[in-house]
Amino acid sequence: MEAKAVARTIRIAPRKVRLVLDLIRGKNVGEAIAILKLTNKASSPVVEKLLMSALANAEHNYDMNTDELVVKEAYANEGPTLKRFRPRAQGRASAINKRTSHITIVVSDGKEEAKEA
């Protein structure tokens, strides 16, 4: 059985979020939370909050035991880009792309759900 949580349009570049997600993918949920608390990255609190949301979804929606859960999937896709301009020398301007992320975390207890035919 799986439970999922999604955070959309987070103002951190996906490339930076993936560094944190790579640390927790495949880990036990308790271990993943401990790793996130000690990780000194800007996306760490956002990912931790999202993981807690996935835990709450698993417990509330599917009556899963939160002690057995494992981070099955964790990925960050690119969200909409905010385009800004920075003034440069001699009247020019350069484009600055403020990137956003859509972050998804899926937790699983390792048991397969019964498929209906």
UniProtKB/Swiss-Prot annotation:
PROSITE patterns, per the entry: RIBOSOMAL_L22 (PS00464)
InterPro entries in alphabetical order: Ribosomal_uL22 (IPR001063), Ribosomal_uL22_bac/chlpt-type (IPR005727), Ribosomal_uL22_bac/org-type (IPR047867), Ribosomal_uL22_CS (IPR018260), Ribosomal_uL22_sf (IPR036394)
CDD domains: Ribosomal_L22
GO molecular function: rRNA binding; structural constituent of ribosome
UniProtKB keywords: Ribonucleoprotein, Ribosomal protein, RNA-binding, rRNA-binding
UniProt-listed GO biological process terms: translation
Gene Ontology cellular component terms for the protein in this record: cytosolic large ribosomal subunit
Organism superkingdom: Bacteria
Pfam families: Ribosomal_L22
Function noted in UniProt: This protein binds specifically to 23S rRNA; its binding is stimulated by other ribosomal proteins, e.g. L4, L17, and L20. It is important during the early stages of 50S assembly. It makes multiple contacts with different domains of the 23S rRNA in the assembled 50S subunit and ribosome. The globular domain of the protein is located near the polypeptide exit tunnel on the outside of the subunit, while an extended beta-hairpin is found that lines the wall of the exit tunnel in the center of the 70S ribosome.
Oligomeric and partner information: Part of the 50S ribosomal subunit.
HAMAP family: Ribosomal_uL22_B (MF_01331_B)
NCBIfam families membership: rplV_bact (TIGR01044)
Protein name in UniProt: Large ribosomal subunit protein uL22
Origin species: Staphylococcus carnosus (strain TM300)
Lineage: Bacteria, Bacillati, Bacillota, Bacilli, Bacillales
